[in-house]
Amino acid sequence: MENTKTNASSSGMFSSSSFSVSYAEEMLLADEVSKINSMSILGPNQLKLCTQLVLSNGAAPVVLSLVSKEKKSISNRMLPKIGQRMYVHHSAIYLLYMPNILKSSSGSITLKLFNEATEELVDVDTDHDATQACIFAGRYPRSILAKDAAKGHDLKLVVHAVASTKANSAVGVLYPIWEDELSRKQILERGADFLKFPIAETEPVRDLLNAGKLTNFVLDRTRLGVGSKSDPSPVLLEPRAKITGKAKTFFIPEGPSVPNTTISGIAPSVRIDAGSPKGLGVPKGFTYESFIKDEILPDH
């Protein structure tokens, strides 16, 4: 098979040069590429979950390429001559959306597919309730040229979120899952709308503490009274001075007097008879003179 290659010269005139290709060799190379694509690491039935997209309220639309780096790498390294004969198919596209906002809030999510090579837009959903979890399922009905995909002119997912919540806060998270198959055959499918499968809210992850555990929780953190104490009922309080009875006078009898003598210059004193019933609790016959002489002045 012979083809003509046209180039632009420096003078601005176009010149042509011919080159020859072998259809058999081209098909053989295309088949080899298809076999590589069927390997487990790049299998055509292997769905890709590359990332998660956090959708912020009022932020710029999020744009994600739906052609994996593996397919672009194959296109760049192995398809310099047969890029026109290799295609990327998107036979399955799933978009799992999980909201971050409550049912009491409001908002909408817009999802579109954009073929950058042809600049065509396909609506996935233009007004999805941002509070509702769901899975979108569909496909792109045309093939993407492998040479375009290698240059980045591939199929893009465009997502935008707007809600009644705080600006730039997380409205929800989108998990794109897709299949990008590299093949030498083109697809020509009827266009179909994406299916939407709502996801119901689940039951609580775990049950709350039972009454016994809650009681123990309170007892561990609360100081409680003991017994059945209760406050008195309010009554009229009348403050009055208490009148005491007649004062009583007590007499402590003196002991018998002692001779008026002087010991070492110390004046005599009265002897205290502590042995009497109303004594002061000191030994019988105790005198301060003897105490001073025996205890305080033993060396004199």
UniProtKB/Swiss-Prot annotation:
It is found in: Host cell junction, Host plasmodesma. One of its GO terms (biological process) is transport of virus in host, cell to cell. One of its GO terms (cellular component) is host cell plasmodesma. Pfam families: Bromo_MP (PF01573). The keyword Transport applies. The keyword Nucleotide-binding does not apply. Transports viral genome to neighboring plant cells directly through plasmosdesmata, without any budding. The movement protein allows efficient cell to cell propagation, by bypassing the host cell wall barrier. Acts by forming a tubular structure at the host plasmodesmata, enlarging it enough to allow free passage of virion capsids. Belongs to the alfamovirus movement protein family. This is Movement protein. It comes from Alfalfa mosaic virus (strain Strasbourg). The lineage of its organism: Viruses, Riboviria, Orthornavirae, Kitrinoviricota, Alsuviricetes.
